[in-house]
Amino acid sequence: MLESMFTEKEMKEVIKEKYNIEVIDLEKINRGSASITKIITKDKNYILKEFQDKYDKEFIIKEINIINFLKKRNIKVPKYISCKNGKYYFFHNRRVVIMQEFIEGYTINNNNGTHNQIIESAKYLGLIIKELENYEKLYSWNINEWFN
């Protein structure tokens, strides 16, 4: 897990500046390789994700494009929130930062799911793979680089 480069005060100010969203509270989410913070507002919740330095904006733009592609095909994926300037990301201390709508749910540790949870996960993975077969740009990228 990556530590945030924001203080709590800075994060609230930047969210107001970049997204025009008033933050009520912040909650750290301790999972994944990025720094993830749940953003609680009056109307809905979001996550703010700060990526490791090794992920440049081109990498993040690829991810955003794929997620938006899947969303248009009714796959349950997080919705990216655009900044006031229309971009889906910004930089803070050399890190790429994005905001997504928060999705209620649960996370299962590796090898700890029930039979039904594994079947449900496999179903969604199959749907994602099926739709990505129609994503033309995918074949022009070196996917192996994503996992190094």
State what each model feature region is.
Residues 1-25:
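Juxta-kinase regulatory segment immediately upstream of eukaryotic protein kinase catalytic domains
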Residues 27-30, 79-82, 139:
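Short beta-strand
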Residues 93-106:
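Conserved short submotifs of the Hanks-type protein kinase catalytic core
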